[in-house]
Swiss-Prot record:
Binding of NAD(+), residues: 270-284
Cofactor(s) of this protein: FAD
Protein name per the record: tRNA uridine 5-carboxymethylaminomethyl modification enzyme MnmG
Organism expressing this protein natively: Rhodopseudomonas palustris (strain ATCC BAA-98 / CGA009)
Keyword Cytoplasm (UniProt): yes
Location in or out of the cell: Cytoplasm
Residues bound to FAD: 11-16
InterPro entries with a match to the protein in the record: FAD/NAD-bd_sf, GIDA_C_N, MnmG, MnmG-rel, MnmG-rel_CS, MnmG_C, MnmG_C_subdom, MnmG_C_subdom_sf
Lineage: Bacteria, Pseudomonadati, Pseudomonadota, Alphaproteobacteria, Hyphomicrobiales
Family: Belongs to the MnmG family.
Keywords from the UniProt entry: Cytoplasm, FAD, Flavoprotein, NAD, tRNA processing
Subunit structure: Homodimer. Heterotetramer of two MnmE and two MnmG subunits.
Pfam families for this protein: GIDA, GIDA_C_1st, SAM_GIDA_C
Gene giving rise to this polypeptide: mnmG
Gene Ontology cellular component list: cytosol
Length: 622
């Protein structure tokens, strides 16, 4: 086996798989280090991909030729478009997945890269020299050299599981933690913190009374995540919905002192938007019930994931809770829920490229950066792996900004503001939601991926054909026009102003759909239905997109004003508070400075004026 690589990725979870694949796609000799290859692509918590905000990230990963979308399509057993009744900007694709099918598809994808090796073992230490990473050492003493290293340890970094009054070191149930790497981080001076997450008990679906719960089917037809998936062929299933009861709440209140979160056993912070059932009852005790989604974990696996009752209460209390929930009174618990604490690095230690500021060539992605969720991890993994490969090859690193995609929003939030709790993506975090839609991720990012060399031949050809078809369809819709009187004959009530309106103009009306304009102009029938959807969305948002484009241009102007080498003591007019905050955080651009707490518009104006003066000075002396 070779002992030297361009890029080494530590961890085979969602971040690690995307990082290794991204580095390999741009030609880097890559190694993926994981405890066991059999666990690569494992879904540690819920058996689902996507959702509100998260589905956008999956589509963006796919647009850059990442793996998650195609793997979820291969393993998905129920697909739903969340927020379907709302506007396209906030719709979120989501899929239930068969755990075995998902992991198998991911492992097959990883094995498909000829320049990607898998090394089984525990990464125990980082190696570095002269301020740059040089490789890693495994627990068995083996050493591997690399020009760049990506760390994606998930919950394994000094992981500690809590179940009732018991606790023990683990990275996941029945899997050992990663202990040594934290020592390397501390030796390098990284600021570490502790975070917590949890998971619910697993149930035997054969013992659930499905007649007592509401059944929820998926969408028909199912809409894939990836543009390269022509159709979903995996058999589809239904999920169940039930609720907690007042009896459930009484059991929890009587035993809440035995929860590690309330006994003082756990001191770290958990995800605000994925609270334990104990938290729900303590904080929202006035509710008469909390919804629970019963999600099958596989087509040939009886295990059911009860989404909504994450808990670390003692095992016997969990059984008592289940007996109070409709449909679960006689269910058998296959495995208790638990909480897990783990180390994370303050993400303000990172550049927007996800390279660390302290050690060149070292990149971090996923829960180690303080995020929660498979999709957040995958998006970071892709960016970190891509930049690790570029770094190893001596190329310029790439930054995805807040106007590029949700992955840019997330990374900017992390490296600019840091975190006080596990970070989860929501559509509300993005300023430019109208342009950053799940349906146009490929239109926004695939060309950028092509320029970076991370998009393969198949996607490149598909993208070229799609963009050509979209351009032709828009041109056709804009070339066909009608008067208000003519429109009235087709049942369309327009302002009788005598102005001709194109088919594209008509589609901008909220109440007019593609089928109606196609009935007027039969030639629109030749447009592929998938392309027609894009044309209609673009028309609906056209006026708003023009305004948002102006906002993005202003944002990009601020982002182009670099602050990397500024001596803030030499900037006249800055307040002491602003100067202190800027020195502490060292923002890269004026735009990033504006997103720091305590930096006023006046301070930004002073900075921008100072930079322009300095630029003029350099030009006059150059």
């Amino acid at each position: 086996m070779r002992t030297s690589f361009d890029v080494i990725v530590i961890g085979g979870g969602h971040a690690g798989c995307e990082a290794a694949a991204a580095a390999a796609r741009i030609g880097a000799a890559t190694a993926l280090v994981t405890h066991r290859f059999a666990t690569v692509g494992a879904m540690s918590c819920n058996p689902a991909i996507g959702g509100l905000g998260k589905g956008h990230l999956v589509r963006e990963v796919d647009a850059l030729d990442g793996l998650m979308g195609r793997v979820a399509d291969a393993g998905g057993i129920q697909f739903r478009m969340l927020n379907r009744r709302k506007g396209p900007a906030v719709r979120g694709p989501r899929a239930q997945a068969d755990r075995k099918l998902y992991a198998a598809a991911m492992q097959t994808a990883i094995q498909g890269f000829p320049n990607l090796s898998v090394i089984e073992g525990e990464a125990d230490a980082l190696l570095w020299q002269d301020g740059r990473v040089s490789g890693i050492r495994l627990g068995d003493g083996r050493e591997f050299a690399a020009a760049a290293v990506v760390i994606t340890t998930g919950t394994f970094l000094r992981g500690l599981i809590h179940l009732g009054e018991r606790s023990w070191p683990a990275g996941r149930i029945d899997e050992a933690p990663a202990m040594g790497l934290s020592s390397s981080f501390e030796a390098l001076g990284f600021k570490l913190g502790r975070l917590k997450t949890g998971t619910p008990p697993r149930l035997d679906g054969r013992t659930i009374d499905w007649s007592a719960v509401e059944m929820q089917p998926g969408d028909d037809p199912a809409e894939p995540f990836s543009v390269l998936t022509p159709a979903i062929t995996t058999p589809q299933i239904e999920c169940g919905i039930t609720r907690t009861t007042t009896a459930t709440h009484e059991v929890i209140r009587a035993n809440v002192h035995r929860s590690p979160m309330y006994s003082g056993q756990i001191q770290s912070t958990g995800p605000r938007y994925c609270p334990s059932i104990e938290d729900k009852i303590v904080k929202f005790g006035d509710r008469d019930g909390h919804q629970i989604f019963l999600e099958p974990e596989g087509l040939d696996d009886p295990t059911v994931y009860p989404n909504g009752i994450s808990t670390s209460l003692p095992e016997e209390v969990q059984r008592a809770i289940l007996k109070t929930i409709p449909g679960l009174e006689r269910t058998e618990m296959l495995r208790p829920g638990y909480a897990i604490e783990y180390d994370h690095v303050d993400p303000r230690e990172l550049e927007p490229t996800l390279q660390t500021k302290r050690l060149r060539g070292l990149f971090l992605a996923g829960q180690i950066n303080g995020t929660t969720g498979y999709e957040e991890a995958a998006a970071q993994g892709l960016v970190a792996g891509l930049n690790a490969g570029l770094s190893a090859g001596g190329g310029d690193l790439v930054v995805f900004d807040r106007a590029d995609g949700y992955l840019g929003v997330m990374i900017d939030d992390l490296v600019t503001r840091g975190i006080t709790e596990p970070y989860r993506m929501f559509t509300s975090r993005a300023e430019y939601r109208l342009t950053l839609r799940a349906d146009n991720a490929d239109q926004r990012l695939t060309d950028k991926g092509l320029a970076l060399g991370c998009v393969g031949v198949e996607r490149s050809a598909f993208h070229h054909d799609k963009m050509s078809a979209l351009s032709d369809a828009k041109a056709l819709a804009q070339s066909l026009s009608i008067t208000p009187n003519e429109a009235a004959k087709h049942g369309l009530a327009l302002n009788r102003d005598g102005q001709r309106r194109s088919a594209f103009d008509l589609l901008s009306y909220p109440e007019i759909e593609w089928a109606q304009v196609r009935a007027i102009w039969p030639e629109l029938g030749k447009v592929d239905p998938a392309i027609a959807v894009h044309v209609e969305i673009d028309a609906k948002y056209h006026v708003y997109l023009e305004r948002q484009t102006a906002d993005v241009e202003a944002f990009r102007r601020d982002e182009s004003l670099g602050l990397t080498d500024v001596d803030y003591a030499a900037v006249p007019g800055l307040s002491n508070e602003a100067r202190t905050r800027l020195e502490r955080h060292r923002p890269h651009t004026v735009g990033q400075a504006g997103r720091l707490d305590g930096i006023t518009p006046a301070a930004l104006g002073i900075l921008a004026a100072y930079l322009r003066r300095e630029q003029r000075k350099r030009k006059s002396t150059g």
